[in-house]
UniProtKB/Swiss-Prot annotation:
The gene is thrC. Pfam families: PALP. One of its GO terms (molecular function) is threonine synthase activity. It comes from Mycobacterium tuberculosis (strain ATCC 25618 / H37Rv). Belongs to the threonine synthase family. Loses less than 10% of the initial activity during a 10 minutes incubation at 65 degrees Celsius. At 80 degrees Celsius, 90% of the activity is lost over the same time period. This is Threonine synthase. Signal peptide: none annotated. Its EC number is 4.2.3.1. Activity is not influenced by the addition of S-adenosylmethionine, the allosteric activator of TS from Arabidopsis thaliana. Was identified as a high-confidence drug target. Catalyzes the gamma-elimination of phosphate from L-phosphohomoserine and the beta-addition of water to produce L-threonine. The modification N-acetylthreonine is found at residue 2. Its cofactor is pyridoxal 5'-phosphate.
Amino acid sequence: MTVPPTATHQPWPGVIAAYRDRLPVGDDWTPVTLLEGGTPLIAATNLSKQTGCTIHLKVEGLNPTGSFKDRGMTMAVTDALAHGQRAVLCASTGNTSASAAAYAARAGITCAVLIPQGKIAMGKLAQAVMHGAKIIQIDGNFDDCLELARKMAADFPTISLVNSVNPVRIEGQKTAAFEIVDVLGTAPDVHALPVGNAGNITAYWKGYTEYHQLGLIDKLPRMLGTQAAGAAPLVLGEPVSHPETIATAIRIGSPASWTSAVEAQQQSKGRFLAASDEEILAAYHLVARVEGVFVEPASAASIAGLLKAIDDGWVARGSTVVCTVTGNGLKDPDTALKDMPSVSPVPVDPVAVVEKLGLA
């Protein structure tokens, strides 16, 4: 007896296989993949009711290493392997190192990570350690680490720099815009996302414009990039020497993709704005409690920025908005645990438990 299937399952092939004809990949290249991409676009029904907009969340924390970085890393490591390079190198506050280490392990090559002094989310660093990365802490901030990494890659051609200054990273990350259009059938009115090193806003804009040039969409979104107030060089129009924010993934004072990010903002008639740590944390708790989506603090910057832009009228009620939430909340559990309530035991008694829950 043959049992009919209860669901149709179409295995996702990874971003290179899914969009190979739109990516700079050689015919004889073998993708280094963990089946990244294909992440859900979730209708944020409660946020939509609260704001009067139609909001969708692009949940990039469901990529293999828990962040959007995997889209670009499959391209970067595939490219490095195809060109015979023996190691990949990155400067990282966490997510890039986790992704680079995983894909390097998959490819069988060395991964080296330069991390700054100061706050690093341990959940992210643990991933890089588990994948066998060689980690070196630098006496400086992220921007110092990236400058050093650039010099090393320039001086040693067997090493590939896989930060978002590597253009093939942007190529991989643009596929998220393709996926959004493929699901919605059009571009959103506004696309909101966090901005740190600014590669992602660059990549999304590239993806949307390529689909527009191909005639697959007839409009382009306005790009809304939110930075943490303590690390907001694009908002201020000048580098920040000592960036500081609870959102460690966007604690960057001089974005590597500054020029292309400004182009994306200007060409889309978009906007950069700053959200305080308090506003970011409020959005972090809000999206977890009303939508069931647990994100790391930096991811919540996109929602914090959107709420501010709705309040000041820049985003009109009734607009269709996509918010990219870039990383999983398990990347930075310490932030969530700061609000852990004190726990006191109750008797082994159902009535006592129901009363404790306030359900009596």
